[in-house]
């Protein structure tokens, strides 16, 4: 049992390192841009009626904060507000519909209540990368109560689970054609607005804090901003992440 838990954590660590590797590479490219949406689905209570929350960031700039209680759209630069609003408005309804669908799926998913401690808590991270010469694609990461993990790649419509237990849930979810369609077409429905905003030059915020841990990737805090000096720093970070990835694989053996 303990070995299985450790193996599960290793799989999750490797999965996060792969995402970090992707960001480390694209952050080293001057023309690389990204849209990231963090979704949270949880059980509401009388004291806290919040059951879903969505935050979307473009190149670390928060453009949309949406929940079943309120909605806020913002941009880091007044000159970008109009375009950020267009992106936020386009994403709002699809995200609302998706969160409702996710809530239904979590409610109907059988999980080990000892692992989930009651109603499952779902975290979903969508990452859309855009870089010249590369095909734009989105990656969806699913984390159910820090116990079940799986990923969907829209580029080749493939799924990957962290372990067998996660695979059981993943296979049921991927057989839902309507659900998969929502994941696949969320970005294409707003592709024009998103791409236009991503193409705009932006003054990205500088970070004075240390790099986030792997577990912070699924939180609502922004990712570390790219370097503006040279692409060399980006490739150095890739090398460090790659070394960490090798260690993770070694421990998982």
From Swiss-Prot:
Coiled coil, from the record: none
Cystine connections: 37-56, 90-190
GO CC list: plasma membrane; side of membrane
Membrane topology: Lipid-anchor; GPI-anchor
Modification after translation, per record: Glycosylated.
Bias kind Basic and acidic residues: ranges: 197-206
Known tissue expression: Expressed predominantly in embryonic brain.
UniProt keyword Oxidoreductase, yes or no: no
Signal peptide range in chain numbering: 1-28
InterPro entries reported in the protein's UniProt record: MHC_class-I_related, MHC_I-like_Ag-recog_sf, MHC_I/II-like_Ag-recog, RAE-1
Glycan-bearing residues: 38, 70, 83, 143, 156
GO biological process annotation, one example: defense response to bacterium
Propeptide intervals in chain numbering: 230-253
Localization, UniProt: Cell membrane
Residues with lipid group (GPI-anchor amidated serine): 229
Alphabetically ordered keywords of this record: Cell membrane, Disulfide bond, Glycoprotein, GPI-anchor, Lipoprotein, Membrane, Signal
Keyword Disulfide bond: yes
Positions of region (Disordered): 197-230
Induction per the UniProt record: By retinoic acid.
Family recorded in the similarity comment: Belongs to the NKG2D ligand family.
Biological role: Acts as a ligand for KLRK1.
The protein's name: Retinoic acid early-inducible protein 1-alpha
């Amino acid at each position: 049992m303990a070995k299985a838990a450790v193996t599960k954590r290793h799989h999750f660590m490797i999965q996060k390192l792969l995402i970090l590797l992707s960001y480390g590479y694209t952050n080293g490219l001057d023309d690389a841009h990204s849209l990231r949406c963090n979704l949270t689905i949880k059980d509401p209570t009388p004291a806290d009626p919040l059951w879903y929350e969505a935050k979307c960031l473009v190149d670390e700039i928060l453009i949309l904060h949406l929940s079943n209680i309120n909605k806020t759209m913002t941009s880091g630069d007044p000159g970008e507000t109009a375009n950020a609003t267009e992106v936020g408005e386009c994403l709002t309804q699809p995200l609302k519909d998706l969160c409702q669908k996710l809530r239904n799926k979590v409610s109907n998913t059988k999980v080990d209540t000892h692992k989930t401690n009651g109603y499952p808590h779902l975290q979903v991270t969508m990452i859309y990368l855009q870089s010249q010469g590369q095909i734009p694609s989105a990656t969806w990461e699913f984390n159910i109560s820090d116990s079940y993990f799986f990923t969907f790649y829209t580029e080749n419509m493939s799924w990957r689970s962290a372990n067998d237990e996660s695979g059981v849930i993943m296979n049921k979810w991927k057989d839902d054609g309507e659900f998969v369609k929502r994941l696949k077409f969320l970005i294409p429905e707003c592709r024009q607005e998103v791409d236009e905003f991503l193409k705009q030059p932006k003054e990205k915020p500088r970070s004075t804090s240390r790099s986030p841990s792997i577990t912070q990737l699924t939180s609502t805090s922004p990712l570390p901003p790219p370097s503006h000096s040279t692409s060399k720093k980006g490739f150095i970070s890739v090398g460090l992440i790659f070394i960490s990835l090798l260690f993770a694989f070694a421990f998982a053996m």
